[in-house]
Design a protein with these regions (language model features):
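Alpha-helical adaptor scaffolds
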Residues: 73-141
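Solenoid-like repeat scaffolds
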Residues: 25-26, 56-65, 92-101, 130-138, ...
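Bacterial N-terminal signal peptides that target proteins for export
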Residues: 1-8
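Conserved small-residue packing positions in alpha-helical repeats and bundles
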Residues: 40-41, 75, 113, 148
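Terminal, low-structured helical/coil segments at or just beyond the last alpha-helical repeat
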Residues: 166-211
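Bacterial N-terminal signal peptides
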Residues: 8-16
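N-terminal leader/linker segments that initiate helical-solenoid repeat arrays
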Residues: 19-73
Length: 211
């Protein structure tokens, strides 16, 4: 598994170079773009059992068109099963093999961010979401609530309110009531929705001015 050790080194370098680079752009006025390619879970083969994982490893070893999606799917399974270091190494392999301008790259950042966030690595997750936005012309609908969640979780609460305000500006009838969160954010956990409800309460108490 030398390639996993190589991947771990690559990821360590990636995280080291971005650790101090968590400055987000100021929120834009509106975020209407669906950005479906980014927010779709990376799945090469349906399933999450040992047989599926073995087939995914075969795709990785063949290094064909689906190899990086297979790596990302394996990485998620590894991180969710307690093998975080191996999962990180697998993600690093996928990043190394994916061009900066590839549509897959933003999806890798988005998926890796969620895996990091759910392991309690909120600052790292925030930086991965930032990179999912970097250099792109879209203004994705996922960005305001997701960045609000990450910023609030890292203690950057004024910035979290700015991003939540962008969600409300974009879809005021959707984001002005946390009761809608289960419908709007079906893949979020209850704890994540509760955290966003804290952001909402703070925004409601003192909504930031625009611009």
């Amino acid at each position: 598994m030398g390639y996993l050790r190589t991947g771990a080194c690559a990821l360590a370098l990636l995280l080291a170079t971005t650790a101090g680079a968590q400055t987000l752009p100021a929120p834009a006025e509106f975020y209407f773009d669906a950005d479906t390619r980014t927010v779709t879970p990376l799945v090469a083969i349906e399933g999450d059992d040992d047989q599926t994982h073995a087939r995914l490893m075969q795709l990785v070893d063949r290094n064909g068109r689906a190899a990086e999606t297979a790596r990302a799917q394996l990485a998620r399974a590894l991180m969710r099963s307690g093998r975080e270091d191996t999962g990180r190494a697998m993600y690093a392999q996928a990043f190394t093999a994916t061009a900066n301008r590839s549509p897959l790259r933003s999806a890798l950042h988005w998926n890796f961010a969620w895996d990091l966030y759910r392991l309690g690595h909120h600052a790292e997750a925030l930086d991965q979401w930032r990179q999912a936005l970097d250099g792109r012309l879209v203004r994705p609908a996922w960005a305001p609530p997701t960045l609000a969640l990450a910023l609030w979780s890292t203690g950057r609460r004024d910035e979290a309110l700015q991003w939540y305000a962008a969600a409300v500006r974009t879809e005021p009838n959707l984001w002005n009531d946390p009761a809608r969160y289960p419908t709007l954010l079906p893949d979020w956990t209850d704890a994540e929705r509760r955290t966003l409800a804290e952001v909402f309460a703070a925004w409601q108490a003192a909504p930031p001015a625009w611009p």
